[in-house]
A protein has these predicted regions:
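Acceptor-substrate binding/catalytic loop of class I
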Residues: 89-100, 127-142
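Class I SAM-dependent methyltransferase SAM/SAH-binding core
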Residues: 1-46
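Core SAM-dependent methyltransferase catalytic element
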Residues: 150-152, 171-191
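Conserved class I S-adenosyl-L-methionine
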Residues: 84-122
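A short acidic, Gly/Pro-enriched loop at the edge of an enzyme's catalytic core
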Residues: 44-56
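A short glycine-rich, Lys/Arg-flanked "PGG" loop and its adjoining helix->strand segment in the class I
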Residues: 69-84
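Short alpha-helix
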Residues: 122-123, 134-158
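A short SAM/SAH-binding and catalytic strip from SAM-dependent methyltransferases
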Residues: 54-69
Length: 191
């Protein structure tokens, strides 16, 4: 989606990196744009020439990698001067407790979201689409300092809440999304 959107907004060329061949195949099936190049590799392995890109975008991927600071250094190198780095991750409050499940009473009502071992960064195992996946919990400090210590200035940090229309349309599902942040959106610029 992001690749197609970038081309629609006037990007001359777009490079997409993903480890999953299935995700790449689905992306390729949605467009035949010659402006989009799809590469299968771990995101940590990117090694593009310096000043190759004006913008780097990532959606919900960095909580699957161990070294955010190391990745920031690589992204900074391949961005042109003043280039933008925009990404989303699962919020550190959401990833702190590996189970990523609400604590409930005997009737199944959500009591609270568990936040434990927040400052203990590292591997967490969570269920995702019926499978156990490995994620790397990082603190908010780790994300912000990973940027600042690798040549970026922070432009905006957003903890999104459900839109009012979603709250009205799906009150049973969405009301709990106001009780804890699930996502973190970040916009930074290369210094």
């Amino acid at each position: 989606w992001h690749c197609r959107y970038a081309v629609e907004q006037g990007a001359a060329s777009v490079v997409s990196v993903d480890l999953s061949e299935r995700m790449l195949a689905e992306a390729r099936a949605m467009t035949d744009s010659p402006a989009i190049q799809y590469l299968r590799m771990p995101i940590e392995a990117i090694d593009f020439p310096a000043d190759s890109f004006d913008v780097a975008i990532s959606s919900l991927a960095f909580h699957y990698i161990e070294s955010f600071g190391g990745l920031c250094a690589k992204v900074n190198r391949c961005l042109s001067a003043g280039g933008h780095f925009v990404f989303s991750v699962e919020h550190p409050v959401f990833t702190a407790q590996g189970s990523q499940e609400w604590h409930c009473d005997a009737q199944g009502n959500h009591l609270h979201w568990p936040v434990d071992s927040y400052f203990s960064e590292g591997v967490r195992k969570a269920g995702f689409l019926g499978e156990e996946v490995m994620k790397y919990h990082k603190t908010l400090t780790a994300y912000v300092n990973g940027l600042l210590q690798n040549g970026f200035e922070l432009l905006e940090l957003v903890e999104p809440q459900p839109e009012p229309g979603l709250l009205e349309a799906y009150p049973e599902i969405m009301r709990d999304e106001l009780r804890r942040p699930m996502m973190l959106l970040v916009s930074a610029r290369k210094r």
